Structures are given as structure tokens and as C-alpha cells.
Regions:
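Short, hydrophobic secondary-structure boundary micro-motifs
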Residues: 7, 33-35, 62-66, 132, ...
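Hydrophobic alpha-helical transmembrane segments of membrane transport/permease proteins
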Residues: 1-45, 143-160
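Alpha-helical transmembrane segments of integral membrane proteins
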Residues: 79-112, 128, 152-294
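An internal, D/E-rich "acidic patch" concept
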Residues: 32-98
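Generic structural marker for isolated residues within well-ordered, non-membrane alpha-helices
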Residues: 6, 20, 119, 136, ...
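Hydrophobic alpha-helical segments of integral membrane proteins
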Residues: 19, 23, 27, 46-62, ...
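Hydrophobic aliphatic residues
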Residues: 1, 9, 13-14, 27, ...
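Membrane-water interface segments at the C-terminal ends of transmembrane alpha-helices
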Residues: 1-2, 118-147, 167-172, 178
Length: 294
């Protein structure tokens, strides 16, 4: 309730009613949630918490946080550190997963394929927190190659982002490679592959030229759908590595009970998710001429 939010923000349960009421008035929480029966006409609906705090989000007017800071300005400032981490992680992770899964498919029914699948299952079974802690222990404490955490501008950004990117790529390799391996194995059983082999093409050419090209359609649509969400950052990685992105911004808002920020980030994430789905449908029609909108 707004009263609980006020007590949490002020600090403590033994807060005077006047202090609680003052906090609610300053932040617009002194009004009813959906319907204000004390008003007349349109004001019954406009003089409410929902209208004044949620409806402006439709025009991407995020307003101010409960501490009085401009949320829109914070999002613009924190968007770039999130992208600096998310874009290389996404590109490198996808490329490495494709190469690794193709190698497993090339050596299918061999010991290499078997142990590769075992490694993938083990990797996807381990929590991402383990990779973060292990990476900080190995590369920062033992080898002293990169800092534990932090962020800086310019070329110094590389040394602060190197460890988070490596950890994120390794953490997602197991699940992505396992999925892509199944996708490539399904393609190998199709008629065009048998036709290519009957023409005398080598297994390497069949796999890397024909199978990969035809399997790129679902990979492309999945990648395009994920692109808008890169702006949202990573909650865990940014918090552990001290990166001032949108992920850590959201997590700090949750821990600080700043529901204005949480509301804005949920709306932004939902909007980007919808944009991603639309982009995936469009890319599907562009990549496959047989598919058309009706």
C-alpha cells in the first residue's frame, strides 16, 4: 500500500501519520487507485494513482522516481553500459554456439559428440552465479588479469567488460549449443541433404553450406526477437560486476522499493518484447519468400 511504501522510504515502522501523508502527497500517492468518488466527471478517473502514474507511460513519459530523479534521463544514461555488455555477449555467444554445435554434428555418433553433449548438459545445469564467482576468483584474484568489478569510459571499458562478457558467453553456451545441435540434426535428415550427398558433395560442404544456410531461418528469427531486449541489460551480471546499466538500475529499484522505477522498467521491457516479436515476424517473411502475411 502507499502507506507501507512511505514507511519503507522514510525508514521504519514508527513514522508519524503526518510524515506518511506528506510523503504520499509529494509523490502523488494520496489519491485513490482507480476511481476517485470525491471528484466529478472525467476527474473521477484522471485524479487517480493509475491515471497519473501509469497512463503517461504510453507516451514514454516515465516521470520521476520516488526519490525525485528523472527516470527517462536515467534510462538514457544507463542504456549504453547495458548495450556495451549485451551486444558483444549476444554476438560472441551466438557465433560460438553455432560453431560448437556444428562441430558436434560433424562428429556425430562419435565420442567427441557424446562428451560434447555431456558438457552442454553439465554447463546448463550450473547456476550463472557459479560462473560469475568462479570467473572473478580465477581471472581477478588468481591471475589478476581484469578487475573484479567496476566501469569506466573510453578504452578502459574493455578491461571492465572482458570478464562479464566471457562469463556470460560461457554461462549460455551449454543451452544454446544443445538447442542448435538438435536443430542441425533435424536438418540433416531432410531430403535435400541426401540429394547433396548423392551428388558427391563432402560432408563438410553439406554441413557448413547447405545445412547451416537452411537452419539459419529459426536462428535468425530468434536472434531478431532478442535484439530489442538487449537494451534492458542483465540483472545479475550488471549487479555483480558493478556495471551501471538498466539491469542493475532495475534491481536497485526492487531492493529499494522504488515502484516508480519498477513500473517504468516493466513497461519498457514489455514494449521491447512486443517490438521483438513483430520484428521476428517481419524477418521471417523477408528470409523465407514462401511465408506471407495474410
Amino acid at each position: 500500500t502507499p502507506d507501507d511504501m512511505a514507511r519503507l522510504a522514510i525508514g521504519g515502522q514508527r513514522v508519524s501519520a503526518d510524515a506518511v501523508e506528506k510523503w504520499k502527497i509529494e509523490r502523488g500517492y494520496d489519491k485513490p487507485l482507480f476511481l476517485n468518488v470525491k471528484q466529478e466527471g472525467v476527474k473521477k478517473y484522471t485524479e487517480t494513482i493509475f491515471y497519473q502514474r501509469s497512463v503517461p507511460l504510453l507516451t514514454f513519459d516515465f516521470g520521476a522516481s520516488d526519490e525525485g530523479r528523472d527516470i527517462g534521463r536515467e534510462i538514457k544514461a544507463r542504456m549504453w553500459p547495458s548495450l556495451a555488455l549485451a551486444v558483444p555477449t549476444f554476438v560472441l555467444g551466438l557465433a560460438l554456439s553455432i560453431v560448437f554445435s556444428l562441430v558436434l554434428v560433424f562428429f556425430r555418433t562419435t565420442a567427441l559428440d557424446f562428451w560434447g553433449v555431456v558438457v552442454c548438459v553439465v554447463m546448463l545445469s550450473i547456476s550463472s552465479l557459479f560462473y560469475i564467482i568462479a570467473g572473478q576468483w580465477l581471472f581477478s584474484k588468481i591471475l589478476r588479469l581484469v578487475p573484479y568489478s567496476g566501469f569506466a569510459g573510453g578504452w578502459d571499458t574493455l578491461k571492465f567488460l572482458a570478464l562479464p562478457i566471457v562469463v556470460a558467453v560461457i554461462a549460455g553456451l551449454g543451452s544454446e549449443a544443445r538447442f542448435l545441435r538438435s536443430l542441425f540434426l533435424e536438418e540433416i535428415g531432410k531430403d535435400y541433404v541426401r540429394t547433396a550427398r548423392a551428388k558427391g558433395l563432402s560432408e563438410r560442404v553439406v554441413l557448413f553450406k547447405h545445412v547451416l544456410r537452411n537452419a539459419l531461418l529459426p536462428i535468425l528469427t530468434g536472434a531478431v526477437a532478442s535484439l530489442p531486449l538487449l537494451f534492458m541489460g542483465s540483472l545479475i551480471s550488471e549487479s555483480f560486476f558493478g556495471i551501471p546499466g538498466l539491469g542493475s538500475y532495475t534491481l536497485d529499484a526492487l531492493s529499494g522499493q522504488d515502484f516508480s522505477i519498477v513500473r517504468a522498467m516493466v513497461f519498457l521491457g514489455s514494449s521491447l518484447y512486443i517490438v521483438g516479436l513483430i520484428m521476428a515476424d517481419i524477418s521471417y517473411t523477408l528470409a523465407d519468400p514462401r511465408v506471407r502475411f495474410e
